[in-house]
Amino acid sequence: MDNVIHTDDFQLEMGTAEIPAGQEERRRAERQGDGSAGECQSAVRLRRPERRQMAMVMQCPDDLVSATHPVRRVAEVVEHLDVSGFCQPIKAREGVAGRDATDPKLLVSLWLYACVRGIGSGRELARQCQENVAFQWLCGGVSVNHRLLSDFRTDHGEALDRLLTQVIASLVDKDVVKVSRVSQDGVRVRVGAGASSFRREERLEKLLDEAKQHVEELHQRLDSPESPVAAVTAKQAAARKRAARERQERLEQAIAQLPELKKRQEEAATRAGQGKCGKKIREKEPRVSTTDAEARVMKMPNGGYNPAVNVQLATDTESRAIVGVEVSNEGSDSAGLSAPMRQQVEERTAGKVEEHLLDGGYLRTQDIEEAHEQGVALFVPPKPARNPEKRGRELEPKPGDSEAVRAWKQRMKSEEGKQVYKQRAATSETVNAELRSWRGLGRITVRGLAKARCIALWCALAYNVMHFATVLLG
């Protein structure tokens, strides 16, 4: 009878196969034990991984996640949405040669669930699709790469805007969202541009001349057959040309921003007057980032100054749903951002905003009078008086007050107005905190306001889908 060695997973017959190298010594060491505690101690029995053991696994992809997993809710909501706006740029059509395009519903589901999980990178999402069972369940065997995911995330601004409108309209139809009272707040989000990438006009002009010269020299070197650089592949040559061309384009975009910045600077100096403040503003030269021309240095919540964008969010105070999204490079909320947001909310919901809650940074007499003419009651606190003796008397009527200003002061002094205004912090502040902490709005790594707005729309969509999935599916 042949000798048989009993192992954890199989029996190896001597004579029919060889003992794997090192296995006999390992088994002997296990039988002998450590020996440090004495010969009478029993051998330790352990379950060790057998990573070379072949096995046949039969599994249905639908069994990867449980029936109550949140990813199923995201997929179900997307199945009920109209994503035809994402299909228009697709070139793969019936009767036309070419590879089939990836279903936009899959890509929408992937990015929505990525925002739910706080993932804000195309490479990280592609990695999760390889390693995470929830994302594997969403893919259902369809392969995706980081370039496809990143392009889809920022190339469909209009379709994303319509998708958010579609979700909000569904909530309005189900009588969940009512925009009679809306709260608005801005959150400054750090962008990818570095603080040292900001340059003045003289330096930008010099860099642009150098970039143009570099593009010309690069084309000559790569296109010349006698040049040693011509030995690079066509793909490498195209990549070098593209990088040089994109740098030149970024510098041209930065220079194109200077007239607008100069105009704003002159307006700020005019408001400051001819004193020291106005003189200080006039002496300062505007600077633009060579990485992201539309980014601006803003004062952040931590008190520091960093390149950022201003993400404006409007929230329904009753349902806490996000009903408006806008992105600007205005460092101050007092730059007339309330009226455009009110108009956007009314267009999305076909409703009428009657009460608009704002923090003190939005206070402008012009906005108060404009809202009064439209029949909208603004709830915004006054700015504290500079004179300590006059603090607490900011809402007292003055001889030159207009009818709109008098109505606003009376409204903010009343007990009813104070109770209404308390809802602003309970809605806008908590929604902003959730998007920054859990929905991927902590930092924006794309360049330009248009792409930054796409990121904000994805985050708002993920927020609404997660909080109102039951209503949307009902």
What spans do the regions from the language model cover?
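Glycine- and acidic
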Residues: 59, 89-96, 106-114, 321-328, ...
